[in-house]
């Protein structure tokens, strides 16, 4: 397995590099950064090698400048984490125009070098996923973003804590924008296979408070420690494992939709997808209730507006 991380010197990129390097499937890990970050990346490589000492990992780690991307050839997955980081008080959409130029540049270069899968992490992730898809001209199954996968995990944890059950008993997800217009799917939430609405405590569930906490978790972490890294890195690892092991799990990622949800088209947005060796094998259409459809359509319209603005940058 060969994985490339573009933007590996950043918080999420470096944390992801460590987690991936520890995996037994990892053979070649390529860390890409701008020229001024090469020393930091070389230090990261040596630090990771120290962490791997005495483990079963035999990953080869390579460091290269983004001026020489030929090294990414034959990568199974290219992860893009590059971009201007979000600061406290800054919305994800504020980042769109600046980061679109960065992501678009890399997407074009990747497409020139290899036929691979592009996994976008850069925020606002739905808009950046669309930009990477448009500029790479890859098939829709090859380009996807982290989307609301981490948001869904945070929501799952909150539900488990409220009902006092093991997290594995909870099945739920959040769709839509990775941002303010995200949509929790209570209609598709269950505990131990039982619809959540059938539990007596459901009427006490502070759903608005929980969703607000999920929405602002990233900003909370930025305020407390400068930025998140471990949560996103673990979520990224989940997705890469699905690809490597051809797990065909249903994850909520940012994917291009073409009418699967209420006729919405030409936008990348967080939806349930079946993910395996070929990337997105299927955008899984599910039945939403009336309020969820309205909220999802609103979310798609918000993303689409920004996609149109950055499409030709």
UniProtKB/Swiss-Prot annotation:
Disulfide bonds: none
Catalytic activity line of the entry: a (2S)-2-hydroxycarboxylate + NAD(+) = a 2-oxocarboxylate + NADH + H(+); a (2S)-2-hydroxycarboxylate + NADP(+) = a 2-oxocarboxylate + NADPH + H(+)
GO CC annotations on file: cytoplasm
Compartment(s) where it occurs, according to its Swiss-Prot or TrEMBL record: Cytoplasm
Listed EC numbers: 1.1.1.375
Record: active site: 178
Gene Ontology terms for molecular function: L-2-hydroxycarboxylate dehydrogenase (NAD+) activity; L-lactate dehydrogenase activity
InterPro entries reported in the protein's UniProt record: L-lactate/malate_DH, L-lactate_DH_AS, Lactate/malate_DH_C, Lactate/malate_DH_N, Lactate_DH/Glyco_Ohase_4_C, NAD(P)-bd_dom_sf
Positions annotated to bind substrate: 86, 92, 123, 154
Chain positions recorded as NADP(+) binding sites: 7-13, 34-37, 99, 121-123
BP GO annotations: lactate metabolic process; pyruvate metabolic process; tricarboxylic acid cycle
Keywords recorded for this protein, A-Z: Cytoplasm, NAD, NADP, Oxidoreductase, Tricarboxylic acid cycle
Signal peptide: none
Listed SUPFAM superfamilies: LDH C-terminal domain-like, NAD(P)-binding Rossmann-fold domains
Main location: cytoplasm
NCBIfam families, A to Z: PRK06223.1
PANTHER family attached to this UniProt entry: L-2-HYDROXYCARBOXYLATE DEHYDROGENASE (NAD(P)(+)), L-LACTATE DEHYDROGENASE
Function: Catalyzes the reversible oxidation of (S)-malate and (S)-sulfolactate to oxaloacetate and sulfopyruvate, respectively. Can use both NADH and NADPH, although activity is higher with NADPH. Oxidation of (S)-sulfolactate is observed only in the presence of NADP(+). Can also oxidize tartrate. Cannot reduce pyruvate, nor alpha-ketoglutarate.
Subunit: Homotetramer.
Similarity comment: Belongs to the LDH/MDH superfamily.
Protein name, per record: L-2-hydroxycarboxylate dehydrogenase (NAD(P)(+))
Organism for this UniProt entry: Methanocaldococcus jannaschii (strain ATCC 43067 / DSM 2661 / JAL-1 / JCM 10045 / NBRC 100440)
């Amino acid at each position: 397995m060969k994985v490339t991380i573009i933007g590996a010197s950043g918080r999420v990129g470096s944390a992801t590099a460590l987690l991936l390097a520890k995996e037994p499937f990892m053979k070649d890990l390529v860390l890409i950064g701008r020229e001024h970050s090469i020393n930091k990346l070389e230090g990261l490589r040596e630090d990771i090698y120290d962490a791997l000492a005495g483990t079963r990992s035999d990953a080869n780690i390579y460091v290269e400048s983004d001026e020489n991307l030929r090294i990414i050839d034959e990568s199974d997955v290219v992860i893009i984490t590059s971009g201007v980081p979000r600061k406290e008080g800054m919305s994800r959409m504020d980042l769109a125009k600046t980061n679109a130029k960065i992501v678009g540049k890399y997407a074009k270069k990747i497409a020139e070098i290899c036929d691979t899968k592009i996994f976008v992490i850069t925020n606002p992730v739905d808009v950046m996923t669309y930009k990477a898809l448009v500029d790479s001209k890859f098939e829709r199954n090859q380009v996807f973003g982290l989307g609301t996968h981490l948001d869904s995990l945070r929501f799952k944890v909150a539900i488990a804590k409220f009902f006092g059950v093991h997290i594995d008993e909870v099945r739920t997800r959040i769709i839509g924008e990775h941002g303010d217009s995200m949509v929790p799917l209570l209609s598709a939430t269950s505990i131990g296979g039982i619809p959540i609405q059938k539990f007596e405590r459901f009427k006490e569930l502070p759903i608005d408070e929980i969703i607000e906490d999920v929405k602002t978790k990233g900003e909370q972490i930025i305020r407390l420690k400068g930025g998140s890294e471990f949560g996103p890195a673990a979520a990224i690892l989940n997705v890469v494992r699905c690809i490597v092991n051809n797990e065909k799990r249903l994850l909520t990622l940012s994917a291009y939709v073409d009418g699967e949800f209420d006729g919405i088209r030409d936008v990348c947005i967080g939806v349930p997808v079946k993910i395996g060796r070929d990337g997105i094998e299927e955008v899984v259409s599910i039945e939403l209730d009336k309020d969820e459809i309205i909220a999802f359509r609103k979310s798609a319209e918000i993303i689409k507006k920004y996609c149109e603005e950055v499409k030709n940058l």
